[in-house]
Amino acid sequence: MANTTGKKIKDAAIIGGCASLIYLTIGDISYRLSLSRGGLNSKLITDMVAKSAAKKPKNEYKEKLDSMIDDGADWFMHQDTEKIIIEKKHRQSLYADLIRPDKPSNVYIICIHGYTSSPANMGIYAKKYHELGYNVLLPSLRGHGDSEQDFITMGWNDRLDVIEWINYIAERHPESKIILHGVSMVLQPP
């Protein structure tokens, strides 16, 4: 009797261990696919999405929006941006592009991109702010663009980075007015 109880416990432990291993493996694959640079940000995935989108029925609104985003990204790529780096001693440095207006201004817009995006994709907004005569700072969030981090933090650590950028501007330009503009996962209330 004791022998069969011991066997049942052993079998249950083996099954539980295997189930846990499968669960952890699936979780790790999902995490790496959705939150790493090689996941949804990879060229393979973006090419697959583009091919899939090409097969879908035309949507005038989406086509117009995509065209505007592409125009903004093209504008951004042709700007003379100043590369800003906040060096960190014990963690990855922060990176951003700064586009200065034609005439000096004390207004700074921090334009923050969203999930699987980049500062260039915020060009649609940066262009308008630049035309209005504002300084535009476009940070690369963690796991995106110039960022040193390999994984996306879905805004959790990025919120602290935004505070760093605000402090960066305020320390150098105490009279500045700072406006935050973000899409997707950023600027969520704490």
Residue ranges with predicted function:
Residues 189-190:
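Hydrolases whose catalytic domains are alpha/beta-hydrolase-1, hotdog thioesterase
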Residues 106-114:
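Short beta-strand element of the alpha/beta-hydrolase
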Residues 13-86:
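An N-terminal hydrophobic leader/cap segment in hydrolases
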Residues 114-124, 136:
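Serine-hydrolase catalytic-loop signature spanning alpha/beta hydrolases and amidase-signature enzymes
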Residues 152-173:
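Alpha/beta-hydrolase active-site loop
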Residues 126-148:
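Conserved alpha/beta-hydrolase
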Residues 89-100:
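A short loop-to-beta-strand scaffold at the N-terminal edge of the catalytic core in hydrolase folds
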Residues 173-184:
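Alpha/beta-hydrolase fold nucleophile elbow
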